[in-house]
């Protein structure tokens, strides 16, 4: 709880007009948070994969590559070039929606309850931080639309009692999509932070 209060008190500085160094500091906090979440996602995925037979891993990976994540409905840059051309506000907007899309879904992740229980509060922290960064970076030329305008429905089989191969596939899909989305958010926030430094090389 203390960590959340500290984050909010620090990030709230961004709501007022501050020098570029303050904005960079706020972004540094957000980037640190998403790096931690991405690491947790990788560990959960690795833990789950370690319980599978080699052939099961191969088949599930093949299926996943042909399937879609729920968050694919969120319009985002298609490659690194488009990412680099996107505005800071756009990257923050997409990051917010990606994080928000996992607030409910993350409760169903496999791979270890000790790690999974860390994810929900950290997603909430990051979501709050990104919202404050969005407010700090809005101007008359580019206004951010309501972040709650797009609400993704949960995965279709969340409420179904699954077993065997279907349960295995759902668990693999959730973990793979979560890892993929946390990587996206880490990339977008890192580029957005870099864009505030005119002398920096933001090449991906």
From Swiss-Prot:
One of its GO terms (biological process) is animal organ development. Its main location: secreted. The keyword Disulfide bond applies. GO terms for molecular function: growth hormone activity; growth hormone receptor binding. One of its GO terms (cellular component) is extracellular space. Pfam families: Hormone_1. Residues 1-17 form the signal peptide. Growth hormone plays an important role in growth control and is involved in the regulation of several anabolic processes. Implicated as an osmoregulatory substance important for seawater adaptation. This is Somatotropin. It comes from Seriola quinqueradiata (Five-ray yellowtail).
């Amino acid at each position: 709880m203390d960590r959340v209060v500290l984050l909010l008190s620090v990030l709230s500085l961004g709501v007022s007009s501050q020098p570029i160094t303050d904005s960079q500091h706020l972004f540094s906090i957000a980037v640190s948070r998403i790096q931690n979440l991405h690491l947790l996602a990788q560990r959960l995925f690795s833990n789950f994969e370690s319980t599978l037979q080699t052939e099961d891993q191969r088949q599930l990976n093949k299926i996943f590559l042909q399937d879609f994540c729920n968050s694919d409905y969120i319009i985002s840059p298609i490659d690194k070039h488009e990412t680099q051309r996107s505005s800071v506000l756009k990257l923050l907007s997409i990051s917010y929606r990606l994080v928000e899309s996992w607030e409910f879904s993350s409760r169903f992740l496999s791979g270890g309850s000790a790690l999974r229980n860390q994810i929900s509060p950290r997603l909430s922290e990051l979501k709050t931080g990104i919202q404050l960064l969005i407010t700090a970076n809005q101007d008359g030329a580019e206004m951010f639309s309501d972040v709650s305008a797009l609400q993704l429905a949960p995965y279709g089989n969340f409420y179904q009692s699954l077993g065997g191969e279907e349960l295995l596939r759902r668990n693999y899909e959730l973990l793979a999509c979560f890892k993929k989305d946390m990587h996206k958010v880490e990339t977008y926030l890192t580029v957005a932070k870099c864009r505030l430094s005119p002398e920096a090389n933001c090449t991906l």
